[in-house]
């Protein structure tokens, strides 16, 4: 497949790009700063005309959108959050209407507040924060494109990345873990594999991409400690 990964320098984007390249796909990446591991286009999604040119100029089979602004940064920058998390996914989908190109949009399980559950694809999206709501608005639901809702863990090439694994690897001494906070997410590698399979099977609509069993964040941190810190 001819694949374009938008936001290739993020925690998800870099793993997805490398996975698809290693599987033999023709991968082009789009990022604000250089991504040296694949063919790379440097640009900014806020430059709308250039961004649309990147999407339209090559007849890609698959575009994976990993662009977004996260958590407290979304709350602190509401206009940027609406543009990147809500508007850009629909702009891409609208632009691709007359192309065969499929869009896979990355959403989040944060569209649900987590106060009830279990949550299904058609459950009411009751996320409370500005980030939660902008991501909910950015979900694409049609019979061509695909939205994956998920929570992810994995390595980050950005030393300032805010992911749980990156945070854990920078900690020293005793740290706290939540025994009642359940996590049902997947690794970024599993996400990349799921995206490849979904594209091959032409999956469309919205799917909650979750693990087949949950784990507390405390137990997840214990696994990190066992396999990456040798039970320090």
Predicted region positions:
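NAD(P)-dependent short-chain dehydrogenase/reductase
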Residues: 128-130, 140-190, 196
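Conserved Rossmann-fold NAD(P)-dependent oxidoreductase catalytic core, especially the SDR/UDP-sugar
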Residues: 90-126
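Conserved catalytic-site region of short-chain dehydrogenase/reductase
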Residues: 72, 105-118, 130-131, 153-158
């Amino acid at each position: 497949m001819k694949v374009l990964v938008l936001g290739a320098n993020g925690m998800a984007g870099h793993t997805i790009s490398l996975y698809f390249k290693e599987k033999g796909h023709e991968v082009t990446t789009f990022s604000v700063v250089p991504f040296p591991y694949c063919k790379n286009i440097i640009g900014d999604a806020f430059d709308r005309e250039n961004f649309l040119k990147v999407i339209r100029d090559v007849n890609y089979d698959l575009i994976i959108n990993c662009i977004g602004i996260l958590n407290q940064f979304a709350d602190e920058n509401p206009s940027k959050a609406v543009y990147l998390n809500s508007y850009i996914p629909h702009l891409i989908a609208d632009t691709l209407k007359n192309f065969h190109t499929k869009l896979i949009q990355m959403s989040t399980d944060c569209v649900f507040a987590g106060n009830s559950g279990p949550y299904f694809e058609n459950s009411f999206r009751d996320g409370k924060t500005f980030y939660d709501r902008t991501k909910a608005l950015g979900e694409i639901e049609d019979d061509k494109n695909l939205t994956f809702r998920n929570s992810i863990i994995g390595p980050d090439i950005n030393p300032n990345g805010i992911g749980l694994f990156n945070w854990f690897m920078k900690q020293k001494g005793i740290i706290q873990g939540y025994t009642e906070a359940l996590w049902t997410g997947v690794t970024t590698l599993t996400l990349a594999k799921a995206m490849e399979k979904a594209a091959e099977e032409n999956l469309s609509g919205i799917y909650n991409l979750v693990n087949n069993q949950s784990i507390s964040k405390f137990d997840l941190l214990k696994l990190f400690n066992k396999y990456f810190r040798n039970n320090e």
